[in-house]
Every structure is written in C-alpha cells, then in structure tokens.
C-alpha cells in the first residue's frame, strides 16, 4: 500500500469516528410535562419516552407559582424538598446523568397534587 493510500484510509477512518461520536453524543432537550409544561398535568409524563445521559429536561413554568427541586427517591416519595437542589427561574434546564432523577415542586401542596416527575437516563 502506498503512503498516499494509507493516509487517505487513515483520514477516512478518523472522519468516520468523528461522525459516529457526534451522532452518539448529541443530546436531546425534552420539555418537562410535554406540551402542558411543568404543572398539574404531569400525569403519565415521562412514560414512554427514552432519555439518555446528557439529555436536557427543560422546566417551564411561572416563577413564584411553581419551582423545581431535584431530590432523592425518599424526598420524591415523601414530597420533601429538604436538602434538594432548588431551581426557581421559570425556565430551568437540567442535564441528565446516569440513573433516575427525581423532581418535585415544593410550593404548597403541589407535589402531593402531582407536580412531580421521575426521569431515568441510560
């Protein structure tokens, strides 16, 4: 194999690797609650959706009316935001890591009324 052909093959292989990495690592953005947004209509969301590590959940809501608190499983089950990571801008973006992440609203009885979601990223 001549030096020119080898260089061409190596360059093509490098380009293929770059293209594969780009398509594998591209993250998707999902609106929390779908078209309804983060609020009282969370029933069934995110059922049926597939999330990957690096995907982004976008929480849109009226600041002051809701918030988003990333909590443990125990906090999720008990609707207890103590020690959780609080987001309150009304346009919050959370990048998913491996495993299940739990989100609740700690305003009034919102969490116990269904303003909560568990999202699993693989």
Feature map (PLM): residue ranges:
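Beta-strand acidic-aromatic groove motif in beta-rich domains, primarily in extracellular
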Residues: 66-72
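A generic structural signal for short coil/turn motifs at secondary-structure boundaries
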Residues: 40-42
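Extracellular/periplasmic metallocenter environments
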Residues: 2-11, 17-38, 63-66, 77-122
């Amino acid at each position: 194999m001549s030096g020119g052909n080898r260089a061409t093959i190596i360059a093509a292989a490098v380009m293929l690797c770059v293209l594969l990495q780009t398509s594998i690592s591209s993250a998707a953005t999902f609106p929390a609650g779908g078209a309804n947004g983060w609020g009282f209509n969370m029933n069934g969301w995110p059922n049926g959706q597939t999330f990957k590590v690096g995907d982004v959940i976008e929480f849109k809501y009226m600041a002051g009316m809701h918030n988003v608190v990333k909590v443990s499983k125990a906090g999720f089950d008990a609707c207890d935001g103590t020690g959780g990571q609080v987001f309150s801008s009304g346009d919050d973006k959370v990048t998913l890591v491996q495993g299940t992440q739990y989100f609740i609203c700690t305003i009034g009885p919102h969490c116990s009324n269904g303003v909560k979601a568990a999202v699993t990223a693989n």
